C-alpha cells in the first residue's frame, strides 16, 4: 500500500512561475505542394500511409486501484497518450462514416487559503430552538446526517433561495410569516449552496465566455495567440458568505475551480464537493477537414475513402505535434483565488508529481476533484484531491464518500467488442472533519443509475447495477440487459498489499431484458424497480452480506422513478402511469404508489393516486403534466409528523387567435401547483389534501414565456404551514384551512451563460444586497 504525500500550498504566498507554451490552431496542410491533384474538383494529401497506421490497440483490464505515478514525466506521458488515443479513435470513426461531415490523479494537497482583510466569521455558538425534522422540514436527503447541496435551504428561522442570478434571504419570525431580508447578486449561474451556522457557500457555474475581457481571469484562462479558445469552457465558483447579519451578507472568500460542478455534501461542518474538469487542447483535432470537392464525388466513389484515410493520418500526425509542444501544467486543472483585488493562480502539481494517481487500467483526460472545506476553520482551508477519470456519480454516508465512474471511456470499446461495461468504485473515509482519506477501490460489471444505487451500511458497500444497458450500436448482437446487486467490504490485496474493495456476495439475473429505473437501500434491504413494458418491484434481503437473495417481486403497470421508504412496512414512490393498453408509459401522467412490504416475500400495492394539474384532465388542450419530483428527489417533500406529501405539478398551453381586425395574438397559459397529499400507513390510503397555486405569478397581460421557470421548485413544511418556492414568488399556506397566509412576489433575473460579467473587488467583505435596512434577523434574539 502506498503512502499519499501531502503538499502544502499557501494561497497568499508567492507561486513559482509556469511557462505556458503558446500554440496556434493547427490546420490540415491542404495546400499546393503538399497535395496531389486527382481532378480539378478535389484534392487529397500526397501522403504514403504506413501499413500499420490504423491498427486497433487491444485493451487490457487489470484493476481499478488508484496507482501513483513515479514522476512528472510519467504523468505527462500517460495523459498525452490518453488524449492522443481518444482523438485517434474519433478520427478512425470519421473514416468509417460515409456521410460524415466534419466540422486525479490522487493527491492530498492540504491548502490553506489566505485570510481576507477582515478575517473569517466565527462558528455558531448557540443551538437553534427550532429543530429540523420536528418543527420544520429540510432538504430531502438520501442519508440521515448527510446534507446535500441544493438551491433552497432553511435553518428554521430563515429561507435561502438561489433565484436566477441572485441569492434571496427571507426571514421567518414566526411560522406562517415571511419577510424579505436581502437580495445578493452572485457571479455566474448559481446552482446550489451549503449552509452551516453563519456561513453559506454558494456554488455557481461561470462560463469562460461570460468573463469580462478586463478581468485578469480572462488572461489566465485564454491560450496565448489562440483567439477564442479557453483552457476550459466552464469554472466552478465558490462564493463563501458571512451571513451573521442576514440583511447584509458579506463575501468572505472567492475561489474558482476549472471544471464542472457535480455535487456537494456536508457532514459535521465539513463540505466536500466534486468537480469534473476536461481541458481544451489547442491544436488538437478529432474531426476531418474534408475538401469541398469531396461532396461532389459519387457516394460510392472509392476516392472518398482514400481522401478520408489520408486526411485522418495527417490529422493524427498533427495531433502528435500539438501535444508534444504542451507542458504538463497546460493539461492539468488550476485553482484561482481573488485576494485583496489580486487574482492568484495555483497549479496543482509538485516537482515530483508523486501525488497523482489513476486507475491501473483506465487512463482518461478528465479530472475528478474532491475539494474538502472545513467551515469551522477560520481561514477556510481545504484539501484538493484529484483522480484522473470519467464523469463521476457521488454517494455519501456519514463516514464514507463513494465515487463511481464508468471503468472505461466510450472510445475504449471501439474495435474491442469483447469488453463489457463496468463501474469503478473509489471509497474515502470522511469520519474526521476536514479530512478525506482514500481507502480503496473495486469494480462491478454494468453501469450504476444514480446515487440511490449505492449504499454503505455497517461497513458493507452495496451496489445495484445493470449490465448490457448501453448496447453498442455497431454490434449485431449486443449482450442482453440484466441487473445485479453486489456487496463489497474493505480488504487487502495479497499481491500488492493495497487496500481494496473485495466482493463478498451478489445476486444476479434480476429482471432479464430490463434495466433499473429506481433503487433504494434501507437497512438490510434493497428495493429495485425495473422496467420494460411493466414495473416489477423487487425486495432483496441483505441481512447476510455474503448471501443476498430476492425475497419477493410484484409486477404492476407503469414505473416508479423514485422510492421513498416510510417505514419497515411501506414504500411511497413517484413515477409515470401506464399507457392506455396497460403497457409502456404515459409520460403525461404523474402517479404515486403506496407499497405494502410488511411481508417482504409478497409485496402488494395498498393504493395508487394519479395526479393532474388541471381540473379536467380529459381537456386535450392540456396534453401533459410535469413534476420535477419524478426525477429530482429534492423536489419530493414528505413530512412524517403530519403524514403529508408535497409534490410540484405543472403544465402550460399555447393559445393563439385573430381579433376582428385580423390581428394575430398569442399567449401562454400556465398552471403551476403544489399538490398536498394525505398518506396514511394505517389505512393504506392516499388522498388529495389540498393545492397551492402559483399560476397567478405567471399568467399576466404580457404573456411572458417563462421556459421551465414557472414550476414550484421546492417546498418546506414549517409548523402548521407550508412554504412553496418558485421563481416569481413564495407563498405561505395554512395546512389546516389551505388558505394563503402571506406571499411575496419576486423578480426573476434570467441566467445567461454567455453574458459578460464585471466582478467587483470583495477584499473588504462586500455584498450587493437590497431589501430590508441593515438590522439583525428578526429571530436573532431567539438564538
Name the predicted role of every residue range.
Residues 2-14:
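Short, Lys/Arg-enriched N-terminal segments with co-localized hydrophobic residues
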Residues 13-16, 772:
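Short, low-complexity interaction segments enriched in Ser/Thr/Pro/Gly
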Residues 18-24:
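Sec-dependent signal peptide recognition
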Residues 26-33:
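Hydrophobic core
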Residues 34-783:
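Beta-sheet-rich non-transmembrane sensory/scaffold domains
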Amino acid at each position: 500500500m502506498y503512502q499519499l504525500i501531502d503538499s502544502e500550498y499557501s494561497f497568499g504566498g508567492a507561486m513559482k512561475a509556469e511557462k505556458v507554451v503558446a500554440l496556434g490552431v493547427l490546420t490540415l496542410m491542404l495546400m499546393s505542394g503538399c497535395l496531389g491533384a486527382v481532378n480539378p474538383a478535389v484534392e487529397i494529401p500526397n501522403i504514403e500511409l504506413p501499413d500499420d497506421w490504423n491498427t486497433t490497440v487491444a485493451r487490457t483490464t487489470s484493476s481499478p486501484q488508484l496507482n501513483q505515478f513515479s514522476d512528472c514525466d510519467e504523468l505527462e506521458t500517460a495523459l498525452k497518450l490518453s488524449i492522443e488515443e481518444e482523438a485517434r479513435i474519433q478520427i478512425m470513426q470519421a473514416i468509417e462514416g460515409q456521410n460524415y461531415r466534419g466540422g486525479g490523479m490522487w493527491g492530498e494537497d492540504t491548502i490553506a487559503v489566505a485570510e481576507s482583510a477582515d478575517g473569517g466569521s466565527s462558528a455558531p455558538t448557540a443551538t437553534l430552538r427550532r429543530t429540523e425534522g420536528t418543527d420544520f422540514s429540510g432538504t430531502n436527503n438520501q442519508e440521515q446526517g448527510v446534507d446535500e447541496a441544493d438551491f433552497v435551504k432553511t435553518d428554521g428561522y430563515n429561507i435561502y433561495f438561489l433565484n436566477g442570478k441572485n441569492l434571496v434571504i427571507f426571514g421567518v419570525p414566526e411560522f406562517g410569516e415571511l419577510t424579505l431580508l436581502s437580495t445578493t447578486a452572485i457571479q455566474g449561474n448559481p446552482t446550489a449552496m451549503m449552509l452551516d451556522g453563519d456561513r453559506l457557500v454558494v456554488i455557481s457555474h461561470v462560463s469562460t465566455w461570460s468573463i469580462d475581457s478586463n478581468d485578469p481571469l480572462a488572461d489566465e484562462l485564454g491560450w496565448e495567440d489562440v483567439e477564442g479558445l479557453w483552457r476550459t469552457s466552464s469554472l466552478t465558483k465558490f462564493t463563501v458568505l458571512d451571513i451573521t447579519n442576514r440583511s447584509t451578507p458579506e463575501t468572505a472568500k472567492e475561489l474558482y475551480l476549472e471544471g464542472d460542478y457535480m455535487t456537494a455534501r456536508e457532514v459535521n461542518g465539513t463540505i466536500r464537493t466534486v468537480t469534473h474538469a476536461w481541458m481544451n487542447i489547442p491544436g488538437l483535432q478529432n474531426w476531418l477537414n474534408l475538401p469541398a470537392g469531396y461532396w461532389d464525388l459519387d457516394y460510392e466513389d472509392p476516392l472518398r475513402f482514400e481522401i478520408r484515410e489520408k486526411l485522418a493520418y495527417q490529422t493524427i500526425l498533427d495531433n502528435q505535434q500539438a501535444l508534444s509542444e504542451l507542458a504538463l501544467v497546460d493539461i492539468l486543472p488550476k485553482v484561482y483565488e481573488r485576494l485583496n483585488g489580486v487574482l492568484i493562480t495555483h497549479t496543482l502539481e509538485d516537482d515530483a508529481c508523486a501525488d497523482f494517481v489513476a486507475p491501473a487500467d483506465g487512463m482518461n483526460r478528465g479530472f475528478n476533484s474532491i475539494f474538502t472545506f472545513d467551515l469551522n476553520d477560520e481561514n477556510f482551508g481545504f484539501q484538493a484531491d484529484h483522480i484522473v477519470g470519467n464523469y463521476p456519480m457521488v454517494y455519501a454516508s456519514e463516514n464514507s464518500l463513494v465515487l463511481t465512474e464508468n471503468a472505461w471511456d466510450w472510445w475504449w470499446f471501439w474495435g474491442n467488442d469483447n469488453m463489457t461495461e463496468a463501474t469503478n468504485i473509489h471509497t474515502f473515509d470522511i469520519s474526521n472533519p476536514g479530512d478525506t482519506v482514500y481507502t480503496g477501490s473495486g469494480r462491478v460489471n454494468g453501469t450504476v443509475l444514480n446515487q440511490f444505487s449505492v449504499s454503505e451500511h455497517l461497513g458493507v458497500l452495496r451496489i445495484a447495477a445493470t449490465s448490457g444497458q448501453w448496447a453498442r450500436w455497431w454490434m449485431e448482437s449486443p449482450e442482453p440487459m440484466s441487473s445485479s446487486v453486489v456487496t463489497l467490504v474493505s480488504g487487502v490485496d495479497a499481491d500488492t498489499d493495497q487496500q481494496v474493495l473485495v466482493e463478498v456476495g451478489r445476486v444476479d439475473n434480476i429482471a432479464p431484458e430490463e434495466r433499473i429505473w429506481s433503487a433504494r437501500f434501507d437497512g438490510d434491504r434493497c428495493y429495485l424497480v425495473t422496467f420494460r413494458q411493466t414495473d416489477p418491484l423487487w425486495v432483496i434481503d441483505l441481512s447476510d452480506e455474503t448471501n443476498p437473495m430476492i425475497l419477493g417481486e410484484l409486477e404492476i403497470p407503469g414505473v416508479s422513478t423514485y422510492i421513498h421508504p416510510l417505514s419497515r412496512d411501506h414504500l411511497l414512490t413517484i413515477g409515470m402511469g401506464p399507457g392506455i393498453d396497460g403497457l409502456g408509459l404515459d409520460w403525461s401522467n404523474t402517479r404515486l404508489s403506496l407499497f405494502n412490504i410488511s411481508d417482504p416475500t409478497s409485496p402488494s400495492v395498498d393504493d395508487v393516486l394519479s395526479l393532474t394539474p388541471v381540473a379536467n384532465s380529459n381537456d386535450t388542450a392540456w396534453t401533459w403534466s410535469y413534476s420535477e419530483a419524478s426525477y429530482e428527489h429534492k423536489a419530493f417533500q414528505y413530512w412524517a409528523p403530519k403524514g403529508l406529501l408535497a409534490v410540484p405539478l405543472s403544465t402550460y398551453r399555447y393559445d393563439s387567435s385573430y381579433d376582428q381586425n385580423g390581428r394575430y395574438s398569442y399567449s401562454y397559459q400556465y398552471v403551476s401547483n403544489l399538490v398536498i397529499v394525505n398518506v396514511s400507513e394505517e389505512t393504506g390510503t392516499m388522498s388529495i389534501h389540498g393545492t397551492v397555486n402559483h399560476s397567478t405569478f405567471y399568467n399576466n397581460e404580457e404573456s411572458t414565456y417563462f421556459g421551465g421557470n414557472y414550476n414550484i421548485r421546492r417546498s418546506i413544511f414549517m409548523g402548521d404551514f407550508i412554504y412553496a418556492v418558485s421563481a416569481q414568488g413564495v407563498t405561505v399556506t395554512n395546512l389546516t384551512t389551505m388558505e394563503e397566509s402571506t406571499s411575496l412576489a419576486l423578480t426573476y433575473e434570467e441566467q445567461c451563460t454567455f453574458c459578460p460579467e464585471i466582478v467587483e473587488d470583495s477584499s473588504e467583505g462586500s455584498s450587493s444586497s437590497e431589501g430590508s435596512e441593515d438590522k439583525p434577523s428578526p429571530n436573532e434574539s431567539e438564538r
